[in-house]
Regions:
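Conserved small/polar residues in nucleotide/adenosyl-binding loops
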Residues: 175-177
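Residue-level detector of flexible, active-site-proximal loop/helix-junction positions
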Residues: 46, 125, 165
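Structural beta-strand/beta-sheet cores of well-ordered domains, especially the beta-sheet scaffolds
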Residues: 35-37, 60, 156, 168
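A glycine-rich phosphate/pyrophosphate-binding beta-strand-loop-alpha-helix module
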Residues: 77-86, 90-145
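Contiguous domain-boundary segments centered on the initiation and propagation of an alpha-helix
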Residues: 142-173
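Glycine-rich phosphate/pyrophosphate-binding loop regions near the starts of catalytic domains
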Residues: 40-100, 110
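N-terminal amphipathic/basic leader segments beginning at the initiator methionine
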Residues: 1-53, 57
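Short capping/connector residues at structural and topological boundaries
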Residues: 67, 130-131, 163
Length: 177
């Protein structure tokens, strides 16, 4: 793959964020031997907000995650975000919805929490069923690798046609009066 001439010379130094841990894995969703899966676990009690596509035909992961914002979650449940690249899990009908349910259920089982506290995102090929087992079988490995760092690996895991990983950071100080 040819790297864009606009690519920065290095990935920026992104600091860990207290209360968040992440891990990546090579699930082989579309390509073998490529990091294509990212998981983020937020401590129990984390408040969440999200921005979703305005597309009139959102995929099953978007539908699930929109509902997850409204579902009641036990106060001691961690929040999870699971993102895969290689398959968008869109326009495969019931198979898309089944893959979402299996992924959220297994993520909650392995990482702790409830399926309703799992947010899902998929990017990649449209119209092909997603084999959720390729993702869920990596969860034990990812759980044992959870760490506060890993932003560059996370950026690489969600690349589709990108030629380089992208990252940015900004620090903000707020005064409470």
């Amino acid at each position: 793959m040819t790297i864009s001439p606009f690519a920065p010379k290095r990935f920026p130094n992104l600091p860990p964020i207290a209360g968040f841990e992440m891990a990546t894995a090579k699930a082989g969703v579309k390509y073998a031997n490529r990091v294509d899966l990212w998981g983020l676990r937020a401590v129990a009690g984390t408040q969440v907000a999200a921005v979703f596509t305005k597309n009139q035909c959102p995929g099953a992961p978007v539908d699930w995650s929109r509902r997850a914002l409204t579902w009641p979650v036990k106060p001691n449940a961690p929040r999870l975000v699971i993102v895969n690249s290689g398959n968008a899990n869109v326009f495969a009908g019931q198979k898309s919805r089944d893959a979402v349910l299996e992924t959220a259920t297994q993520a909650a089982k392995i990482f702790g929490g409830e399926p309703e506290a799992v947010f899902l995102a998929s990017t990649g090929v449209i119209g092909e069923p997603l084999d959720a087992s390729k993702i869920t079988e990596k969860f034990p490995q990812m759980k044992s690798a959870l760490d506060a760092g890993g932003w560059e690996a996370a950026a690489r895991a969600i690349m589709t046609t990108d030629t380089y990983a992208k990252g940015s950071t900004q620090e903000l100080s707020l005064i409470h009066i």
